[in-house]
């Protein structure tokens, strides 16, 4: 094909992708009595009566809420790179955030998260959850997973989630030895969940690493501002 200047033009073929709001679940041809249904799932050896994982965000998941989620049959994932592993009295920190106004928010959050992660508090939070008989799932970012995930497992964590906005099996960095999920799985020896991803290829490569679960989807949730400020957000469903 030639453009108006007589020069050859090349076009890249793109596929249509859909957000969750574009996809509907269509009822099938068979119905079943509610008392005969079973929504339970297993992650490794751990059974969840309801297939719900609560987000590993400081604004969502606290040790207390993780305990309640487990008691209700779901799973609450605690972020152990946030306020719960930086402060002994996290209730005071939450109160400061809640009572701040919009003009203070950015500076306050930068101040709060400037404090270092304390490995001894990782063990304290895990014990806090385990002492109530709850399943303990904890979350780390890929850059800290090799250092902190073994600490959490030694403290009694039942499941480990490695999560970033976008996570891939292959990653370019200045590090000579990057994060290898196959190796990490052998080290922690507990169910390993990884996310997030939003493409078939990335999902397949992560699953081939031997992980136990995959988190699919990259925004735009209630806490995501990409769509608001850029009018762009990753789509999470494709048709082939």
Show the residue positions of the predicted features.
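Short beta-strand/loop segments at the ligand-binding rim of alpha/beta enzyme cores
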Residues: 51-52, 131-137, 185-195
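Glycine-rich beta-to-alpha transition loops that act as phosphate-gripper elements at the mouths
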Residues: 56-61, 139-144, 193-202
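Catalytic cores of alpha/beta
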Residues: 66, 147, 199-212
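Glycine-enriched alpha-helix->loop->beta-strand junction motifs that scaffold or abut catalytic
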Residues: 73-75, 155-159, 208-213
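Conserved small/polar residues in nucleotide/adenosyl-binding loops
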Residues: 229-234
């Amino acid at each position: 094909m030639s453009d108006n200047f007589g020069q050859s033009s090349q076009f890249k073929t793109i596929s249509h992708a859909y957000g969750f709001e574009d996809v509907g679940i269509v009822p099938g041809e068979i119905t079943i009595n509610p008392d005969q249904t079973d929504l339970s799932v297993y992650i490794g050896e751990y059974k969840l009566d309801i297939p719900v994982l609560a987000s590993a965000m400081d604004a969502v998941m606290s040790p207390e809420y993780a305990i309640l989620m487990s008691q209700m049959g779901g799973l609450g994932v605690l972020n152990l790179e946030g306020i719960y592993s930086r402060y002994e009295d996290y209730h005071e920190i939450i109160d400061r955030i809640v009572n701040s106004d919009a003009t203070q928010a950015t500076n306050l959050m930068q101040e709060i998260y400037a404090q270092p992660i304390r490995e001894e508090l990782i063990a304290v939070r895990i014990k806090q959850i385990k002492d109530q008989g709850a399943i303990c799932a904890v979350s780390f970012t890929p850059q800290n997973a090799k250092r902190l995930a073994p600490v959490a497992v030694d403290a009694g964590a039942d499941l480990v989630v490695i999560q970033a906005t976008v996570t891939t099996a292959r990653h370019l960095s200045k590090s000579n030895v990057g994060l290898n999920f196959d190796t990490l799985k052998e080290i922690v020896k507990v169910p390993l969940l990884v996310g997030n991803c939003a493409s078939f290829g990335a999902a397949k490569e992560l699953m081939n690493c031997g992980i136990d679960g995959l988190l699919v989807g990259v925004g735009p949730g209630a806490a995501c501002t990409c769509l608001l400020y850029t009018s762009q957000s990753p789509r999470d469903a494709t048709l082939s």
